[in-house]
């Protein structure tokens, strides 16, 4: 089919004339040719070690993991995090601020979490799921991978003046709960 207006900014005129489309925008109704980038075939699954997991802002973690071997990737590359079945209580989360950024105030973000009443929240995940995260580290950093992750809270219910009774973000809650 014809390219959608939402797809056009992502391609050159030549690519559009060659029929390029975004996979997330195409409804497949007939046979089509798909080109898969070479790096997709080199995908590996690793168990990683959490090196650090500090808050760098009220609702953002700098999550640093170490993988068992170096990975060749380009800027803008991403990894997938596998989230197992789990039950995460926000009251158990450590929101210590990054010691390099706030050396004299490790509890810098606690008051904001108190004010937003985040501590009673709970995330329950009943099945293994995967989520993609863009890497904030450089390939030259070897086996350490850094992700900047924002906590995904439930929507705010203005009538109740509290969080809606829905599950918080599965992956962000899981990542926020991880400790070295």
Predicted regions and their residues:
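FAD-binding FR-type
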Residues: 66-74, 78-180
């Amino acid at each position: 089919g014809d390219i959608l207006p939402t797809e056009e900014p992502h391609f050159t005129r030549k690519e559009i004339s060659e029929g390029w489309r975004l996979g997330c925008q195409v409804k497949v109704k007939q046979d089509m040719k798909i080109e898969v980038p070479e790096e997709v075939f080199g995908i590996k699954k690793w168990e990683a070690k959490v090196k650090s997991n500090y808050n760098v802002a009220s609702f953002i973690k700098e999550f640093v993991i170490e993988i068992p071997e170096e990975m060749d990737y380009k800027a803008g590359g991403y990894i997938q995090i596998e989230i197992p079945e789990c039950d995460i209580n926000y009251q158990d989360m450590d929101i210590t601020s990054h010691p390099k950024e706030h050396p004299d105030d490790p509890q810098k973000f606690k008051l904001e979490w108190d004010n937003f009443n985040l501590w009673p929240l709970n995330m329950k995940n009943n099945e293994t799921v995967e989520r993609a995260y863009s890497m904030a580290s450089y390939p030259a950093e070897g086996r350490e991978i850094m992700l900047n992750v924002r906590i995904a809270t439930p929507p705010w219910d203005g009538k109740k003046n509290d969080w809606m009774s829905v599950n918080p973000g599965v992956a962000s809650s899981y990542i926020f709960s991880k400790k070295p």
